[in-house]
Structure formats: structure tokens, C-alpha cells
């Protein structure tokens, strides 16, 4: 909560979103909301206990669900559930979609990135997920209302749903030309593309006494060299291909 409050106090910061597994939200949600948190993304890949243990290697599904329930008490904080379809039988994607059916919560299905541990899963195509959902809930209609965020997610409405269904399909529906994402790792490295090591070391600049203006120039230089797009489908490993896992990168 203290970090959220500090970030919100910075001039120019318009919105702060927290992505989490939700296990501590039952205790911390009130403080996070009071600190000014605008939006919350909670990772939930299955409602099956054994499946959750298999995916996360931690038996904390009940804590995540309690966190989601607690977050729903704060309507001023936009709530989204992120699900990464892995193509394993323990996942019932329709059960996850029920959150958007029963509550004013947006459920987003995020295509597996073939990075680190993710390269061992086949995942599921957006088309297959749409087919599964439409068989149970009816037609998904492209959402054309006010933006629900500033990212690449494509949202759909379903008759009778309180929330929206979204898809972030970076591989099968490549959106690199519209990408507005950069990531700062826990080691202080600014990454401009998930597939490549391209970026700048901000930690080193800070430790060497870099000024705000110098940091701005470093960031501008990194952005000017942002790759035009990923080449995951080509399955060709270049010298600058990222070897870190998503948990190490931050995302």
C-alpha cells in the first residue's frame, strides 16, 4: 500500500494497476484501495485444487478466491481476472468465465508466451476458447464501448454477463505494431520486448548518480530501439533471445 501511495503522488501518473495472485488481498485490499489503487488483475488459471497445485506448486487456491471475494467489495477498483489457458484437462475455462457472468468482473484469457516454463505447454488458441465459451454461454460480440484499459486486450460482451470476456493473444493475433508496453525488472533492467534482451540498465545509471534528465535520455534511447515485433512462431533462437522466465522478467 505504501508503494501505491508513493506512485500515485508522482505528477503525470494517471493510473496504477496491480497484478497479483491475490493470496494476500483478504488482509491488504482495504489499505490498497485507500492508497488509491485504480485497477487490480488477479491471476486464476483453474478452480480445480489439484490443477492449481500442479500449475502454481502451492496449495493456496482458497486464499486466491478469498482475495477475489474481498476485492469485489471495492467497486472503485476495477477488477479483472487473468487466466492463461495451458491446454491441460484440469482447467475448466467456462468455470473461470462464470466470474464475468455472475459478477461485474472482466475475465481475460491470455495466450501462453513460449518463454521459460511456458514453452513446455501447448496452450489453446483464441478460436478454440471462443468455441468453448459460445457453446455454453452464447455468441461473443465485440465490445465497442468506453476503453476498459490502455492495453492490447480485445473485449467481448455476452448476453446476460455482468462483466466482459477479453483476449490477449500475442502469438496467434500478433499486435506488436500497437504494443505500448515496457517492463522494469526487479534488477532494474528496462525491457522493451518480451522475446529479446533489448533494453537499458537503469539500476546501473542510478547507482552511478544519474540525474532525472539522464534517465529520461536512457529511457528514450531504449524506446527508440524497441524491436518491430517478436518472432516466436519462427522458432529461431537469436543471440539476443531472452532466456529468463516470465516470473524473473515481471509479468
Q: What are the residue ranges of the model-derived segments?
A:
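Auxiliary Fe-S-binding modules of radical SAM enzymes
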Residues: 101-102, 112-115, 119-251
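Radical SAM/AdoMet-radical enzyme domain recognition
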Residues: 1-110
